[in-house]
């Protein structure tokens, strides 16, 4: 009774619409999701080193990648990231691998929690972060244009941004891609892509975001999962695992981990990232959510 009395002092998201959370939100979750992801065949995020024995796990990751590609319009996606924040950070690191330019511009309208994670990832890698100011809750595009030069390797756009406002994505494309070596990284709310322009339509080179809204509870702040998609020519620079489809010697469809030479269990310190299976169970929730 004492615990119930203390609990009753909390304001539940079941009773009110909460606009708190900084990227973690309360959405309707069909009961079928928990039933499916709780099955013993799925209830692990671990991919065996002989991954091909787990065809079911590889297939749902493949389907997840396909869905992320359909949502973002980009041609290749990985198996997931830790969260939206780490996805942005890894995108900046990937941009450096692509163009060898070590300056990145973050908008002042970016989720401040994401900024903290990006700083943690980039400080030890010699990457300089610049902040584009905001004006009336949106990125100041004139200021952004003045900041751009040949030393800038990537620019981030978050839309909807931390304030809930929709950025002018086409303007970002025009400004950023005046420098052909600079990459535009779009951080998007995946549910918004049902009605808003997908990142590929404004030429975002990398599309990332937080996927918690797809069938995952708030869980007091985690676990979460991030999604990551890009152009096919940058596939070998991507972080994380990639599942590909193929045909076995008997002519049956099969799934395999592909481009593994990028990964930490193969190259260790020379890998594109130390991320591996990470949040795969959360991505399964997303797959079931999108299928329903």
How would you describe each model-predicted region?
Residues 1-63, 266:
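N-terminal entrance/gating region of PLP-dependent enzymes' catalytic architecture
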Residues 40-51, 69-73, 99-100, 122-130, ...:
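Gly-rich Lys/Arg/Thr-decorated short loops/hinges at beta-loop-alpha junctions or inter-strand turns
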Residues 48-56, 76-80, 102-109, 158:
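Flexible, glycine/proline-enriched loop segments at strand-loop-helix junctions
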Residues 56-69, 197-205, 253-263:
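Acidic-glycine-rich active-site phosphate/pyrophosphate-binding loop
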Residues 86-250:
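Conserved PLP-enzyme active-site core in the AAT-like
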Residues 214-292:
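Active-site C-terminal subdomain of aminotransferase-like
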């Amino acid at each position: 009774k004492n615990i119930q009395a203390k609990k009753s002092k909390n304001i539940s998201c079941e009773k009110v619409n909460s606009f708190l959370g900084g990227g973690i939100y309360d959405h309707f979750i069909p009961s079928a999701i928990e039933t499916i992801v709780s099955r013993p065949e799925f209830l692990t995020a671990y991919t065996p080193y002989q991954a091909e024995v787990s065809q079911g796990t590889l297939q749902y990751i493949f389907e997840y990648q396909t869905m992320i590609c359909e949502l973002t319009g980009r041609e290749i996606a990985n198996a997931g990231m830790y969260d939206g924040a780490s996805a942005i950070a890894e995108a900046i690191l990937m941009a450096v691998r692509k163009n060898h330019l070590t300056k990145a511009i973050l908008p002042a309208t970016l989720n401040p929690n994401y900024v903290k994670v990006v700083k943690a990832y980039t400080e030890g890698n010699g990457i300089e972060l610049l902040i584009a100011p905001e004006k009336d809750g949106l990125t100041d595009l004139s200021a952004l244009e003045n900041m751009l030069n040949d030393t800038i390797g990537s620019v981030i756009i978050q839309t909807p941004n931390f304030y809930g406002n929709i950025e002018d994505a086409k303007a970002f494309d025009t400004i950023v891609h005046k420098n052909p070596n600079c990459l535009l990284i779009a951080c998007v709310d995946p549910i918004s892509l049902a009605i808003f322009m997908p990142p590929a339509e404004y030429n975002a080179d990398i599309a990332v975001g937080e996927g918690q809204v797809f069938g995952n509870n708030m869980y007091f702040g985690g676990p979460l999962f991030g999604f990551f998609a890009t152009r096919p020519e940058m596939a070998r620079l991507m972080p994380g695992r990639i599942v590909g489809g193929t045909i076995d010697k008997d002519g049956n469809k099969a799934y395999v981990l592909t481009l593994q030479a990028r990964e930490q269990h193969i190259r260790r310190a020379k890998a594109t990232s130390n991320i591996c299976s990470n949040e795969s169970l959360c991505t399964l929730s997303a797959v079931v959510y999108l299928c329903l």
